[in-house]
Amino acid sequence: MHARFAAAFSQLPAELQAALTPVMASDTFNAVITAAQVDAIGHACHLDRQALSFALLPLAAAYALTPISHFQVGAIVHGASGNLYFGANMEFSGTPLQQTIHAEQCAITHAWLRGETALASITVNCTPCGHCRQFMNELNSGTSLPIHLPGRHTATLGDYLPDAFGPRDLQIKTLLLDPTHHGLMLDNAASDPLQQAALDAANASHAPYSQAYSGVAVETPRAVYAGRYAENAAFNPSLPPLQAALILPNMSGDNVNAIRRAALVESRQAPLSQYAATRATLQALGCNDLQHHPL
């Protein structure tokens, strides 16, 4: 089991520790607890799904990277599949605060990148900030998404974000988490797994306002990870593709400071580009090898 969990794990009831150990001690654990595992753990510990999620929040918060705030936030997304996806806030030294990934963004994007196409609810250890409320309003669940907080009655996103402005006000039909494919093509991408991963991510990205479809793939000594752009009706809460890509190595127990090379695929004709911000953030993380493929 990864050392990051030691303190939080030691505080769990012994029965829950015993049920979780086979799952979390696995070398393949990637911050996802499958529906079958949720049922088995809940049965062994006499916990329903929501009680289990509350108990797991400290483990989700253990994924936080907080060199600036030193304040850990954990979130757990309940996918429509029954899986639970961990998320935590991620900050990056040497970059503007705007490059921060909030815990709710992390958990939701984590679920999206793992193939989830709808959410049942989200559980967070702190009240969602306005930025995250607006980010969640881009989801295909809309304002009906249930939000669970310790010590509070369950409320919906609509309760936290009344009179919301979102994609439906702009007649956007394809929403965040809806499957899509933009038809971008890159010659010889199949010869390089990094390029292919970035291309696949760009084709699945959500950018209905700018059509700036984009994806980033990063390579560490362990694996290639890819992330997609998640645009927002309010613009500023949009999550850049690099940030999405950085979620996966962190959730997989890898090191975001161990990136050897990266690739950005994006629409050439779009009114904006991810290149400058992607390059600057990668350089802050110690990576200077960025391939750029405008299509």
Swiss-Prot record:
GO terms for cellular component: cytosol. PROSITE patterns: CYT_DCMP_DEAMINASES_1, CYT_DCMP_DEAMINASES_2. One of its GO terms (biological process) is cytidine deamination. Its EC number is 3.5.4.5. Residues 48-168, 189-295 form the CMP/dCMP-type deaminase domain. It catalyses: cytidine + H2O + H(+) = uridine + NH4(+); 2'-deoxycytidine + H2O + H(+) = 2'-deoxyuridine + NH4(+). Its cofactor is Zn(2+). InterPro entries: APOBEC/CMP_deaminase_Zn-bd (IPR016192), CMP_dCMP_dom (IPR002125), Cyd/dCyd_deaminase_Zn-bd (IPR013171), Cyt/Deoxycyt_deaminase (IPR050202), Cyt_deam_dimer (IPR006263), Cytidine_deaminase-like (IPR016193), Cytidine_deaminase_bacteria (IPR020797). Zn(2+) binds at residues 102, 129, 132. This enzyme scavenges exogenous and endogenous cytidine and 2'-deoxycytidine for UMP synthesis. Homodimer. HAMAP family: Cyt_deam. This is Cytidine deaminase.
